[in-house]
Amino acid sequence: IKRNGIKEEVHFDKVQARIKNLSTKLNINPVLVAQRVCSRIYNGVKTCDLDELASQICTSLCTENTDYGKLAHRIVISNNHKLTNSNFFETMKLLYSQKSPLISDELYNFICYNNEIIQKNIDYDRDYNFDFFGFKTLERAYLFKIDGIVVERIQHMLMRVSLGLHIGDIDAALNSYKFMSNKYFTHATPTLFHSGTTKAQLLSCFLIGTEDSINGIYKTITDCAKISQLAGGIGVHIDSIRSQGSYIRGTNGKSSGIIPMLRVYNETAKYVNQGGKRNGSIAIYLEPHHPDILDFLDIRKNHGNEDQRCRDLFTALMLSDLFMEKLSEAINGGNEFEWALFDSDKSPGLNNKYGKEYETLYFKYLNENKAVARIPILKLWKKIVSSQVETGTPYILFKDQINRTSNQKNIGIIRSSNLCAEIVEYSDDQEYACCCLASISLSHMIKDKNINRNVKIFSKSDCKYCRAAKKLLPHYEDVVVDNKTDRSLLYAELSHKLGKEINSVPQILIGNDKNKDVEYVGGYNELKEYLKPTFDFEMLRNTCKVLVKNLNKVIDLNYYPVPETKRSNYRHRPLGIGIQGFADMLFKLRLPFESENTRKLNIELFENIYFACLEESMNLAKERYNIMTTDEFLIWATGVSEHHKDSDPNLIQFKYGSEKFTLKEIQIFLEFRLDKTRGKYIGAYTTFFGSPLCNGQFNFDLHNKKPQFIKDKR
């Protein structure tokens, strides 16, 4: 059955021809693939199913020849193109015309207005840059479906995401699309899922605190369900929850501890499966002084009491310097310390301390005999390691170091991370930290040496290095110097011109003698070094700047599932920019993973990312400063502040021109606009004042490091 519904007989030649058409420049056997496809044909088989079958056969052959893997992705991409509309506007119109529209009114109207320029800039050939498994992942969960049938192409999705982030600014949208479609970066999964939709929840990471009460516990569980429903990954810290056997004053009873509560979290994660696209995921963070620590370490194990198991949760520990110091002493043969466990109800405050303050309070409670129990620290450590070996968790984070190097010291103590343990932000039961993420693809930022000038190579017939050098060059003029006397004259001439002794071939020169722009390369080894690919740091910095603008937009456009998330994001405006493809990059640069050059490159990469992001963040703040320091803004802000004086300042935003301002930003502006010290920071996020960066401390300062590749201009 063809894609248009017409029935016809299957012909081997047609199957083979389709395979052959898609196998340009591939070393594969179209006949073999066609034979295997035809051997599995049944009555009523659809053409699209034949393509699926052919792609699966190719993937089974890719271990013998990697070109079959390339053919597999060409087949599935071609099949997707045959099943979907090549017009972006028509595809979006289809999504919008559903009974419950899949894209927002704002996005649809923006597309209608810019239809022609959008269609002109979309490039469907870039779909073929995605491999088989990449496309299948996108097809399964990311590309929009109607009645179970995929209607989007990869480029449709990328353009939708870009337009959804930059409604009203077509140039910024097309620039963002260009970067994404060329695979310089990708946005986080929720952004790809929901950008441009009616409920655009675009954030990946949520960090949640829990209050030790029935209302607090079940509110947190409900909030986790709402966040998970919209594809958010969650980290919850539960140190404040009292332990098993702890007294409950309200009922004159005893607490059952954290495990029964965690079982509710576990079932919630299983039930609320992110809109059917992927499983809900929650990580639970605990400090090792909690009395339920031993039971906590067992919850993911495959044996034991089923009532004590929560295998769909991830576990994590926030370890202190004190714990690690006592552990180190025990491992190195000192007296083994009996680690004390304290109930949060009887011994409050430990989870809100770090460093020396934590140590002081810990020993204060210990001396007051408030410990619920004590356990040899080596025994506890072995329990932790055993759990990691068996289940892969708990994650281990170091609370003191996290807080020492935090730019949120002016806000509070960081007590947990997120689901994947790469984001550290302040959170409590009043504000849930969240972060919008994006990932830069380093492997797509490699520059190959492009030789577009004349190349002259002096060689001799029986020279293996000459032959090897010619294989490296795309084009060249070969000057064969087999005569020994002629070679001696050549060596003398080159030695005179270059001011150094030349006594071997090959010798490679690039350029035009007439224009006198000849560049001497050298021999075979020098040519290899000359042609070596390099990393494009300029592209890296430009990518960072595009991402900062995009993620800043995400904060304002996002649909927040609960007000605590909005409060946190509007106050702190955190951005999470990371990398992928590091090993692929090293392979392309021909750098060993453990080499000194790799270590230096790693540092240089992250220095460039850090400073480029800071620079663009500063530029955004300056743009806002220039808007906020006008007389017109002062009049507008005064009216807004007076009219909404009873509103929560961190939950309400107002649009002025193309920018959005929270009521808190407006209040800060009105309070400090004439203050010579704080007034200059108007335009920054509201909790910037008092932060380490506000006081001139960069992240590397907090780590007691200095930049190695970028000049510190302070």
Give short role names for the model-derived ranges.
Residues 392, 450-481:
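Local sequence-structure signature of Cys/Sec-based thiol-disulfide redox active-site neighborhoods
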Residues 5, 457, 463, 472-473, ...:
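Extracellular/surface recognition and adhesion modules
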Residues 8, 254, 459-462, 483:
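Amphipathic alpha-helical protein-protein interaction segments
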Residues 1-449, 532-714:
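Extended catalytic cores of very large enzyme megasubunits
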Residues 510-533:
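Non-catalytic, surface beta->alpha helical segment in thiol-disulfide oxidoreductase systems
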Residues 142-143, 507-509:
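Residue-level detector of beta-strand face positions
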Residues 482-503, 527, 531:
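Thioredoxin-like thiol-disulfide oxidoreductase module
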Residues 294-295, 467, 471, 492, ...:
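Alpha-helical elements of the RecA-like P-loop NTPase motor core of helicases
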